[in-house]
């Protein structure tokens, strides 16, 4: 399957039934490539299915994906025609380990540490709306980066603007506890179902026409629904900020993610999709010790042990060497 991916949108030619095989081939490619060059492995192995699902429901480069930090964008780079560049990953003159606009029209934002993807995505959203254009903007942020103050400032701003904007929370269980999955997923689907949305609107309009008591009944229904949701959906933190919350969803089940991402596209206003992933998935050493494979040098695939490589002088070495120089008087 991987040999069929050579340029953006080639993924749309892949049958849905073949996506699991494509995911497996991408993982194997990443393990083999990073074992030779070094790079960020655990985070990239964790978002293979998430990236495939996003690319499947979006139309790049017209639609925009903003990656927070950016070191988890390797699969994105593969899907946008840079597979052959991995042999020069993070080398001078080679492909960057992060999104770079100079590399591809599909790289929306030159990312860096951290918590800035929602703000950057919101900038694209505002530009789109002011220019009267029509494309999707998706910001992908991890639960660790979501602890940054800039992220919450941007969430608040997105809720205030009330414009269409999708935020994907890539939760690999580092900072945010799991929510009540079954009920939350059910209510998320129910809230965004077109039939339910239409029925809710019609019932509200009809009740408001009832003299004296109609409006009171509507207010009571809203308060009751809100109270029940507060009890069973921890995602109400985001709902209370003014964002529609969908999830959580298994970040390694592509069909479920595609369904939820398509639901997010139907939502009017900002929406946050909560995706649960596992760092290092598909490679046992990285899965058991994701911290050791966050940013790794070349390593032995069988054992996971890093290989000794010849290194150049450190900044400290260079600084020390200058202290021995005799300056002219």
Regions found by a protein language model. Name each.
Residues 173-318:
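Long, well-ordered, tryptophan-enriched scaffold segments
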Residues 40-161, 315-317, 321-325:
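Cofactor-binding active-site loop characterized by glycine-rich and histidine/acidic residues
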Residues 158-160, 164-169, 175-177:
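Hydrophobic or amphipathic alpha-helical targeting/insertion segments
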Residues 1-78, 250, 254:
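N-terminal amphipathic, basic-rich helices that act as targeting or association modules
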Residues 7-12, 31-39, 103-110, 243-247, ...:
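Glycine- and acidic
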Residues 66-68, 167-170:
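Short internal beta-strands
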Residues 136-138, 164-166, 270-272:
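Residue-level preference for the first positions of well-ordered beta-strands
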């Amino acid at each position: 399957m991987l040999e069929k991916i050579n340029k953006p949108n080639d993924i749309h030619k892949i049958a849905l039934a073949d996506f699991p095989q494509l995911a497996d081939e991408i993982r194997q490619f990443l393990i083999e490539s990073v074992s030779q060059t070094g790079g960020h492995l655990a985070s990239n192995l964790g978002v293979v299915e998430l990236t495939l699902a996003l690319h499947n429901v979006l139309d790049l480069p017209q639609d925009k994906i903003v990656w927070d930090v950016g070191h988890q964008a390797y699969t994105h780079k593969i899907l946008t025609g840079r597979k052959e560049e991995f042999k020069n990953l993070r080398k001078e003159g080679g492909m960057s380990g992060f999104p770079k606009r100079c590399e591809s029209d599909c790289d929306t934002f030159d990312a860096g540490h951290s918590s800035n993807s929602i703000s950057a995505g919101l900038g694209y959203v505002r530009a789109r709306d002011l220019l009267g254009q029509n494309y999707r903007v998706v910001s992908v942020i991890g639960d660790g980066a979501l602890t940054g103050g800039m992220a919450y400032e941007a969430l608040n701003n997105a809720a205030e603007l009330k414009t269409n904007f999708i935020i994907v929370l890539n939760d690999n269980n580092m900072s945010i506890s799991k929510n009540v999955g079954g009920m939350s997923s059910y209510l998320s689907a129910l809230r965004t179902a077109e039939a339910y949305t239409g029925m809710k609107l019609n019932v509200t309009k009809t009740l408001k026409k009832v003299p004296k008591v109609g409006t009171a009944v509507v207010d009571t229904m809203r308060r009751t629904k809100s109270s029940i949701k507060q009890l069973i959906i921890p995602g109400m933190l985001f709902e209370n900020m003014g964002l529609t919350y969908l999830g959580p969803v298994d970040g390694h089940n592509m069909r479920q993610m595609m369904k939820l991402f398509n639901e997010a596209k139907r939502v009017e206003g900002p929406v946050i999709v909560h995706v649960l992933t596992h760092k290092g998935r598909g490679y046992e050493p990285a899965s058991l010790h994701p911290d050791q494979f966050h940013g790794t040098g070349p390593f032995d695939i069988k054992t996971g042990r890093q290989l000794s490589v010849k290194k150049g002088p450190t900044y400290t070495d260079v600084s020390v060497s200058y202290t021995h120089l005799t300056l002219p008087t």
